[in-house]
């Protein structure tokens, strides 16, 4: 059975570029990961989390949704689980604004022209994340159209 997403995760899912691989970083329970995989719109879906517990929960969610075989789960810190150019969209949902920008700062390739679309759904401090994006990325990046904050 496919999980139901709340309005913010539904909005995030709708912003993922179809036809390209996608990564759900900080996938936690795996609901968004499962919905993305079950949609059939993406050639590859990666779910990643920092801790084994949430990754195990994501695996259960994927199994119940019948799409475990369409997802690669990775254990690791932020974007260290990805290589530049590996995915077309990265979703960072459910972590704080500060954690979101710390993750982005550790992987400068995400804000380069031709980099992936970055869909951010911070759990807290939305306005601070938007301000940080404006100050640190939007002024210096021609890729601003692919930096989306829900």
What are these regions (language model features)?
Residues 1-18, 34, 59-84:
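S-adenosyl-L-methionine
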Residues 20-26:
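Conserved class I S-adenosyl-L-methionine
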Residues 44-49:
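Conserved SAM-binding motif I beta-strand of class I
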């Amino acid at each position: 059975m496919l999980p139901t997403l709340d309005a913010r995760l539904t909005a995030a899912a709708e912003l993922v570029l179809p036809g390209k691989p996608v990564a759900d970083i900080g996938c936690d329970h795996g609901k968004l990961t499962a919905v993305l995989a079950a949609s059939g719109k993406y050639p590859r879906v990666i779910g990643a989390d920092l801790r084994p517990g949430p990754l195990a929960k994501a695996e259960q969610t994927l199994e119940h949704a019948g799409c475990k075989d369409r997802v690669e789960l990775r254990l690791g810190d932020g974007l260290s689980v990805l290589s530049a150019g590996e995915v077309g969209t990265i979703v960072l949902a459910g972590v704080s604004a500060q954690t979101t920008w710390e993750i982005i700062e550790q992987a400068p390739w995400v804000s380069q022209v031709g980099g992936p679309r970055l869909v951010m759904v911070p759990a807290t401090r939305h306005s601070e994340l938007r301000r940080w994006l404006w100050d640190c990325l939007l002024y210096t990046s021609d890729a601003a159209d692919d930096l989306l904050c829900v």
